[in-house]
Amino acid sequence: MIAQHGCYHQYTTRKGGLFPLNCFSEYAGVPLEQQRSMISCGKKKLEERGIYTDIFMAPGHTFDKNTLKALKECGFSFLTDGFGKKPYCREGLTFLPVSSRKKDCFRGKQGYTTLVIHANGMNASEIGWYERMLAEYPEKFISYKEFMEIPGEKRGFAGNLAEYLQASAKRILVKLIGLRHGNGGNGR
């Protein structure tokens, strides 16, 4: 499965939007018409290469209501983002939640999430860790196709608020830990 990951992957605003894991975005804070144009442009670029998808993942994990509206208008059904233990529905899209911590994917917790891996910034030791986890816990993984077949639950205001607060708290903790470790608080 391939998800469209933005259009240019350039952060043009300092907004966190509805899921503020970061305070920078390609989409959050951008007018609807511009978002629709960028999402459509990215989709066209993929389709010109024979790649058809209705899955989207926002760069920086940041998006707003305009993003969700533009995604629907451009034919997307899924957004791989947000926090939760199983798919949920919001604004007519099915969210496939991401793990808030990679270790949570391998614990005895019930439910499903996606694990976001930025392989381009990993060293051999980190890659080895993932290889070991995949070998040791094969029962903890399902295919993306299977994940997409799990019906999304309707999520209301309380669930959306809890997710917003959790994303905000994680962003702040990552910044504090980064400051403590001397990397300027960008958590990377």
Per-segment meaning from a language model:
Residues 1, 8-9, 13-14, 19-51, ...:
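Terminal accessory/targeting
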